[in-house]
Amino acid sequence: MDLSPVKEALAAKSFDKIADICDTLMLQVASEGIEYHDDWPYAIHLLGYFYVDDCDSARFLWKRIPTAIKERKPEVVAAWGIGQKLWTHDYAGVYEAIRGYDWSQEAKDMVAAFSDLYTKRMFQLLLSAYSTITIHDLALFLGMTEDDATTYVVENGWTVDAASQMASVKKQAVKREQKVDSSKLQRLTEYVFHLEH
């Protein structure tokens, strides 16, 4: 079984392509009738789904993984631990699951990249959902210490009130794009005029 496309994507840090590559290879290997369960990079496959925010597919993959593999490969179980936290929206638990396992060299870079990406996703979620938030809750959402979380949001333009231990969200400017520019509108007007006359 040739897993070189997965290894190449990992080496190139193309983590957003891992899930699709694994899906394609799994279908190819299964259609050829090759026994692949023992050698399959299930942890990487699961992490690939989490990286592209596809918890549904990760959950179905988890259900298809043989019990013997789950019992023999703790990294697969650790990867699924992240999935369980994502599934239940336990934001702080995601970071605990990431830090709670000593990842293999193969998975370490991908887990670190996912952690960074997840922090950015959480920051965007906070940006759209809150006007103010406690420093404690902010640290839980971002998976950081309170000091690091404070520094992170201040660098992104938020204001922090040390007395109340609250952070105020810097609201994004609402961008309103004009759907049709004037030249397109003019051409449409001329076209309709031509059709009517």
Curated annotation (Swiss-Prot):
It comes from the Eukaryota. Its main location: cytoplasm. One of its GO terms (biological process) is response to jasmonic acid. Transmembrane segments: none annotated. It is found in: Cytoplasm; Nucleus. GO terms for molecular function: metalloendopeptidase activity. Coiled coil: none annotated. Component of the COP9 signalosome complex (CSN), a complex involved in various cellular and developmental processes such as photomorphogenesis and auxin and jasmonate responses. The CSN complex is an essential regulator of the ubiquitin (Ubl) conjugation pathway by mediating the deneddylation of the cullin subunits of SCF-type E3 ligase complexes, leading to decrease the Ubl ligase activity of SCF. It is involved in repression of photomorphogenesis in darkness by regulating the activity of COP1-containing Ubl ligase complexes. Belongs to the CSN8 family. PANTHER family: COP9 SIGNALOSOME COMPLEX SUBUNIT 8. This is COP9 signalosome complex subunit 8. The lineage of its organism: Eukaryota, Viridiplantae, Streptophyta, Embryophyta, Tracheophyta.
